[in-house]
Design a protein with these regions (language model features):
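Histidine/acidic residue-rich metal-binding segments in metalloenzymes
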Residues: 1-106, 111-114
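His/Asp/Glu-enriched, well-ordered alpha-helical/loop segment
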Residues: 3-26, 78-79, 105-106, 112-192
Length: 192
């Protein structure tokens, strides 16, 4: 029921509401964990009106679906995150946003839980109600390989775009550029 209780229209409305409040307060806004095309459209409309709205998405929204939440046994609990993964029909919309600059940054939403731990996904009470399953999935170690293999290798995005949304734009958005996010004389040489 996790995906059913968090449908696309709710995310779209929350995106619209956050943008409206940022507009009233006259402040920039970063919308994180965008999982669908309707929320993406809200972001594009706000930008067309001249608002400073930035956007982020994560690996689970280009690789997982709501069906993963229904895997046999209790394995679906491993994929509980919010917003939940959507249908695979949303993937092209997210990829289009990645390719064409709607998404400024690509992050991990890293929030892992040990499956069998007392506070983990299969903790006491979790099987009685999906509401008791901790929200979050690991991602820091898979963010770059997933975007590279699914994006660059499959020619959905360029290598330059990969660098922008995984490094350069993060540094710009958080005021660290050009010391971070660039390979130039005088910048930090923290490349792996």
């Amino acid at each position: 029921y996790h995906a059913t209780t968090r449908p696309v229209p709710v995310e779209r409305e929350a995106t619209h509401r956050a943008i409206s409040l940022a507009e009233i307060a006259d402040v920039p806004l970063t919308i994180v964990h965008v999982s669908n095309g309707e929320a993406t459209e809200e972001i594009m409309r706000a930008r067309q009106r001249g608002l400073k709205v930035f956007a982020e998405t994560c690996p689970q929204y280009i690789t997982l679906t709501a069906e993963d939440l229904d895997r046999d046994g209790f394995d679906g609990a491993k994929y509980v995150c919010s917003p939940p993964p959507r249908t695979s029909q949303e993937w092209p919309k997210i990829w289009d946003g990645i390719e064409h600059g709607v998404f400024d940054i690509f992050s991990s939403d890293h929030c892992p839980f040990r499956f069998n731990d007392s506070a983990g996904k299969d903790a006491p009470g979790a099987r009685q109600s999906f509401r008791n399953i901790p929200n979050g999935i690991p991602g820091v170690e898979t963010r770059l390989p997933i975007l590279f293999s699914e994006g660059v290798v499959k020619k959905r995005i360029s290598l330059e775009r990969f660098a922008e949304i995984t490094s350069t734009n993060h540094a710009r958005l958080y005021g660290l550029y050009p010391r971070k996010g660039s390979i130039v004389v005088g910048a930090d040489a923290d490349i792996a």
